[in-house]
Amino acid sequence: MPNYQLLVNADDFGRHVLIDQAVKRCVEEGCLRSATLMPGGKAFDDAVEVARCHPELGVGIHLTLVNGFPVCEAKDIPSLVTKEGVFFDNHVEFVKHFLKGQIAMEDVRRELMAQAAKMERTGLPLTHVDSHQHMHMLPGVIDISLDVASSLHLDAVRISRTPLFTAFAGMGQLIGRLGLFTLSELSLRKAKRRHFRVPDHFEGIVAGEAVHEGHFLHILKDLRPGTTEVMMHPGTDNEKLIPACDWEHDFEAEMQAIVSPKVRRMIADKAVKVVNYRDLK
């Protein structure tokens, strides 16, 4: 009989208290057993407390190089920050600088190691590494990210291998998926060469669409044998989170999908085991 494992991960844990509240609810009422904590998030300390109160929640490090706040002083990582001392707004801006050779890899290493050190100081038993907007899979950055994981004695990493042609929604989305697919294949080879554990399959948002209840049920209906990670960004209040995160995302829909009775019923009916990164073989 096929073995089905579901690994739902809440990204951006610690970014905002309303995200932390959603993570808490999704653990207590739904199928969430994994979250990745943003070291520079404004609600970092709040998220740490949520994690301490929910030991069943596997917590990883959400390496951040865009759309957030650095752990290092801006003067120590000048190629990574704007004149305001924050990261570039999004992956597009970062990649533009990256392709022009304007991102110093020593700055990347310094910042990501500082993020790892901050996570280590929490004393939480960490499970894995991933990143905000998939930046850890860029050439060169993947090598540093794996080094960061190793420095924390971690041997599990997200590789965002998204199918190219499922649920096609236009050329823009296809281009985004093609880029992510290429980076993921290159990153997977490096991760496997260093004996990192990686989920067998990956689902979640690409080009902005939320994993609402219907989408989640579709993922479960077509679940493949092995471990499938579903990347999600739950939150409790779109009206506050959209401007706070500068992202037109349906945080509430993803929270509702995770706690949905229909989702829980399908998980039970298909005998799917809900896991986190600790359970990866």
Predicted regions and their residues:
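Active-site pocket-lining segments that scaffold enzyme catalytic pockets across diverse folds
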Residues: 136-138
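His/Cys-centered metal/cofactor-coordination and adjacent catalytic loops
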Residues: 12
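Active-site histidine-anchored catalytic micro-motif
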Residues: 131-133
